Amino acid sequence: LMRNQIVLTGATGFVGGAILDRLQREKKYPVTAVVRGDSSLRASVVPVIRIGSFDGDTQWQGNLDEADVVIHSAARVHVMNDVESDPLAAFRKVNVEGTLNLARQAAASGVRRFIFVSSIKVNGEGTTPGTAYTADDIPAPADPYGISKMEAEEGLREVAAQTSMEVVIVRPVLVYGPGVKANFLNMMRWLSKGIPLPFGAIHNRRSLVAGSSSAPSAGISRVTSPLTSAKAP
C-alpha cells in the first residue's frame, strides 16, 4: 500500500498555517492537519485530527498509519508575561517531550520522514559583526524556548539514529506577515499610532522571512524530493 499522506501539526499557528496554505496550493499530496481541542483552521478544508493536549503522553495510534511525512510545527512559543513558575519545564513538556513522543510513534507507524520546525533561537541571540549563523555553529540558546528547541533537536537525532525514519531539522528566522503576533505585532501597532522607533540609532541587522515564503524555509521542498541517505542534518 502506497503511503503518500502528509500529517501537519500546528496548522492553526502562524507558520503552520503558511505551510498548510502552501501544501494546499501545490496539491501534490493529501494533507491531514492536527489541531488541539476545538481549534478551527482558517478557510481550509482538509481532514483534521483532534487531540486534547500535546505532550509526552499524547496517543497517536491509528492517526499516522497512512502518513509518509510528518511536518511538526506545533510548539509552545514565546509567551508574553509568562506566569509559569517554571517556564523551562512548561516549554519542555510540549517542545521536547511532546515532540519526541510524536517522533517515536511516527517511526513505529512507518513514517519515512519527520520534518521538525525548530528555531534560529537554537543558535543564539546574536553573532559578531559581519557574520551570519550557520548550521555548523555550536548551539547557544539563551532563553527557555530556545533551550527546549535545542533539546528536541538532540532527541530527534537520537530517534533518527535508532530508526529508519529520516529527520529533517529546520531553524526559521523571524517570520512576518498577515496574522503575525508577539513583538513584531507590537512594533506594527506602535508605527500605526505614529510612535517613532529608534532604528536609525541601532547598528544591528536581523534576518526575516515573509510568511508567504516560510513554507519552503520550513523544509517543504524536502517533502517532494527523493529520500536521502542522511537521516539528520
Describe the function of each predicted region:
Residues N4-E26:
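N-terminal Rossmann NAD(P)H-binding glycine-rich loop of SDR-like oxidoreductase domains
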Residues R50-E97, N101, Q105-A108, N123-E125:
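NAD(P)H-binding glycine-rich loop region in Rossmannoid oxidoreductase-like domains
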Residues R92, V96, T131, A142-M150, ...:
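Short-chain dehydrogenase/reductase
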Residues E97-P144:
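Conserved Rossmann-fold NAD(P)-dependent oxidoreductase catalytic core, especially the SDR/UDP-sugar
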Residues A140-V168:
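Active-site Tyr-X1-5-Lys
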Residues A160-I169, V173-S213:
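NAD(P)-dependent short-chain dehydrogenase/reductase
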Residues S214-P233:
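Mid/C-terminal beta-alpha module of Rossmann-like enzyme folds, strongest
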